[in-house]
Design a protein with these regions (language model features):
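Mid-to-C-terminal "cap/lid" subdomains and adjacent gly/pro-rich loops that border
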Residues: 12, 23, 33-137
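Structural recognition of the beta-strand scaffold that forms the well-ordered cores
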Residues: 15-16, 46, 158
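Short hydrophobic core segments
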Residues: 10-28
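Short capping/connector residues at structural and topological boundaries
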Residues: 31, 56, 60, 68, ...
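Single conserved hydrophobic/aromatic residue that forms the stacking wall/gate
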Residues: 1-5, 9
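C-terminal catalytic lobe of FAD-dependent flavoproteins
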Residues: 104-189
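ATP/adenylate-binding site constellation spanning eukaryotic-like Ser/Thr protein kinases
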Residues: 2, 19, 30, 60
Length: 189
């Protein structure tokens, strides 16, 4: 006798839910490190140590500054300037509403001896409150950011419970590798 679960299990399945959700789905489905599955009361379908391991993410260092006597995007999405931008957008499509989040990109070497670029730099004529990129600062400002393109630091993702709606624990271990620290400092310079 076969069940729907075993029929699905026998087929090849491609799971593509991203670096965070893929290990979470696998772990709550019983595929992952046995100790994590047992701790969360999940039946072990396949003890696979690497599920949730080796998380790599592009850490960025963002620098912001204030400007005087010049307008930036910060002032545009409020009050009458916002209404003007909405009208411009619907009139001809040219407005701050048609801009991407970053206006200038460049790729850079943190060290002249490196063959491939290992830094991405960005510039935006806007600034955001610390720890938040959902809203703009109220004063005129700009942002410059540097991202390491090939991080070496390894993190992990693990479930907190068997509840698929509970967010997993994410430990990116940013800057834990000395090379990542060096590249971040060079990006700031």
């Amino acid at each position: 006798a076969s069940s729907a679960a075993s029929d699905v299990y026998k087929r090849q399945v491609i799971l593509s839910a991203g670096a965070i959700n893929s290990p979470q789905i696998l772990q709550i489905s019983g595929i992952g490190p046995a100790d994590i599955l047992k701790k969360n009361g999940i039946k072990i379908m396949h003890d696979l140590y690497g599920v949730g391991k080796n998380l790599k993410d592009h850490y960025n260092v963002r620098l912001t500054g204030r400007v005087k006597n010049i307008s930036t995007i910060n002032e545009q999405p409020r009050g009458m300037p916002l209404i003007k931008e909405i009208i411009k957008y619907f009139w001809n499509g040219n407005s701050i509403l048609s801009l991407g989040p970053t206006l200038v990109y460049c790729f850079w070497h943190s060290d002249e001896t490196i063959k491939n670029h290992d830094l991405q730099m960005t510039f935006t004529p806007a600034s955001y409150p610390e720890g938040n990129q959902a809203g703009l600062d109220t004063e005129p400002g700009f942002s410059i950011a540097a991202w390491q393109q090939r991080p070496e630091s390894l993190g992990w993702v693990t479930i907190k419970s068997s509840d698929p709606f509970e967010k997993p624990i994410i430990q990116p271990n940013y800057l834990s590798a000395p090379e990542d620290q060096r590249v971040a400092v060079e990006g700031i310079r």
